[in-house]
Every structure is written in C-alpha cells, then in structure tokens.
C-alpha cells in the first residue's frame, strides 16, 4: 500500500495542472475535487484557448457528459497538443452506449489519440469493448462477461489503463488487474462522483504510472467516501463532508483503510 500512498504525496508536492474539458453538470465539482486532492484545475474548452493551456498542463481529462460540436472541436485541439507534449490523456466516455453520438465520439478519441486512461462504468466500458451491455442514460448499466477480463482485454488492445467503476472498481493496464473495494452506496446518490474520479485519475497519472495512479485515485476517493458517510445524514450533508475527507486524507489513513486486491 505504501507505493500508492506515496502517489498521494507526489500529487500534493507537485501540484500538477490538470486541464479538464468536462460537462457543465459537474464542472465545478470536478474543479474543487482536483484542488482538494492536491492538484490544480483549469477548465477551459475553447479551441482558441486550449492549445496554449495544454502546453503548461500535466494531464488532460476529456469528459463527454454534455457533448456538442464546439466542445468536441476543443477536445480534439487539446488532445492533439497533449499528444505532442506527451502528457497523459484521460477519457471519461459518459453515456457511451446510450446514444450513437456519444459512442462514436468516444470511439473516435480511442482510435485517434494515445489515451493513458479510459474510465467509465460497466455499461460504458462494455459498449466500447464490444460486449453486450445495457446503459440507461449516464447511469451505470450491466455487461455480459467478467469485468476483469473485459478491462484487461480493452486495456491491452489500446495500450492504456482501463477503469471500470462499480461496487468493486476494476483497473487493468493489459498486464496487471486490480480491484478496489473502497466506497459506500451513498456516493451514487450525488451527481458527479464518477466525473470527479476521472479528474483525480488525471491528477495521479500526471505524477505516476497510470495503472498505479488510477488504483490510488479510486481507493482514495472510496476511503474518503467511507469517512464522510460516518457523519452524513443524507446526500446533502455527504457532499461537503466528502470534499473535506479528501482534503484531510493522510498516508496512514490510506494504508490502513485501502482495500486493494491484485488479481494478476
């Protein structure tokens, strides 16, 4: 657990700039969570602006939750520059499988850019992996097959780290497979926890190997959720407590509470 806890320190020490082109539903939460985790956010999406911003960024997070053509144009410009600069690109394919527009957009980024991380729920990742999956809007769906095998296969195909979020988060880089069992059900009662996780994956990938970074990110947020749930009376009080718990998370707490399994 020590190597994962050290990634928390690296993020806080280096304060990486994480450029996020994300959805307007959770943009403020993603920015604040990035700060709470120890990184710095920039949320610019204009094609005229993103290229210069990427030159000083340490990671790029693309979230397709509220897509339109102008945003896609900005994402492409940012991803092209990120490719030139060699910084990690995280794709959160929100709602892939729910509509053709979302699915095709996600597949375009997967095929045209060297992604470091693809992070989504079971339905989204299953759709992109070409297995039978059900997706309801942007909510998690179901897949036919073993999530570990699906994550491993997709990661190997695209040479990246794949994260399937769920009761047990599954992470694979095509070689290793890990599971994270931290978290509480109330995390699913507020919008944006998945988007925030992608932002934090970006922060961790900026300072470490993407596989270890994603394991750290998912475990850290899960531990913080468990801590926040101890005092929360419901979703309304859980959310600020969650941000506080992320901010105050220590290495010792992480090492003690992380439930990480290495399957391969």
Swiss-Prot record:
Cofactor(s) in the UniProt record: Mg(2+)
Gene Ontology MF term list: ATP binding; hydroxyethylthiazole kinase activity; magnesium ion binding
Keyword set, alphabetical order: ATP-binding, Kinase, Magnesium, Metal-binding, Nucleotide-binding, Thiamine biosynthesis, Transferase
Xref: Pfam families: HK (PF02110)
EC number from the UniProt entry: 2.7.1.50
GO BP terms: thiamine biosynthetic process; thiamine diphosphate biosynthetic process
Residues the record lists as binding ATP: 119, 165
UniProt pathway: Cofactor biosynthesis; thiamine diphosphate biosynthesis; 4-methyl-5-(2-phosphoethyl)-thiazole from 5-(2-hydroxyethyl)-4-methylthiazole: step 1/1
Reactions catalysed according to its record: 5-(2-hydroxyethyl)-4-methylthiazole + ATP = 4-methyl-5-(2-phosphooxyethyl)-thiazole + ADP + H(+)
Binding site for substrate: 43, 192
Family classification: Belongs to the Thz kinase family.
Biological role: Catalyzes the phosphorylation of the hydroxyl group of 4-methyl-5-beta-hydroxyethylthiazole (THZ).
Protein name, entry field: Hydroxyethylthiazole kinase
Species per Swiss-Prot/TrEMBL record: Methanocorpusculum labreanum (strain ATCC 43576 / DSM 4855 / Z)
Lineage of source species: Archaea, Methanobacteriati, Methanobacteriota, Stenosarchaea group, Methanomicrobia
């Amino acid at each position: 657990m020590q190597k994962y806890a050290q990634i928390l320190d690296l993020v806080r020490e280096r304060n990486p700039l994480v450029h996020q082109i994300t959805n307007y539903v959770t943009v403020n939460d993603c920015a604040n969570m990035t700060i709470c985790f120890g990184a710095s956010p920039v949320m610019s999406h204009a094609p005229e602006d993103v290229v210069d911003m990427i030159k000083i960024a340490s990671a790029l997070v693309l979230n397709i939750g509220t897509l339109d053509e102008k945003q896609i144009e900005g994402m492409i410009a940012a991803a092209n520059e990120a490719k030139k600069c060699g910084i990690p690109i995280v794709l959160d394919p929100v709602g892939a499988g729910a509509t053709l527009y979302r699915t095709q957009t996600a597949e375009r980024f997967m095929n045209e850019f060297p992604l470091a991380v693809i992070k989504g729920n079971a339905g989204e990742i299953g759709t992109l992996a070409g297995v039978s999956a059900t997706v309801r809007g942007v909510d998690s769906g179901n897949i036919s097959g073993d999530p570990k095998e699906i994550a491993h296969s997709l990661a190997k195909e695209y040479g990246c780290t794949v994260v399937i979020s769920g009761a047990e988060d599954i992470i694979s880089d095509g070689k290793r497979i890990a599971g994270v069992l931290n978290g509480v059900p109330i995390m699913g009662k507020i919008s944006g926890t998945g988007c925030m996780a992608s932002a934090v994956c970006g922060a961790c990938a900026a300072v470490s190997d993407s596989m270890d970074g994603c394991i750290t990110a998912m475990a850290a947020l899960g531990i913080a959720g468990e801590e926040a749930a101890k005092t929360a009376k419901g979703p309304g009080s859980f959310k600020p407590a969650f941000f506080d718990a992320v901010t105050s998370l220590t290495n010792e707490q992480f090492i003690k509470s992380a439930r990480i399994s290495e399957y391969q």
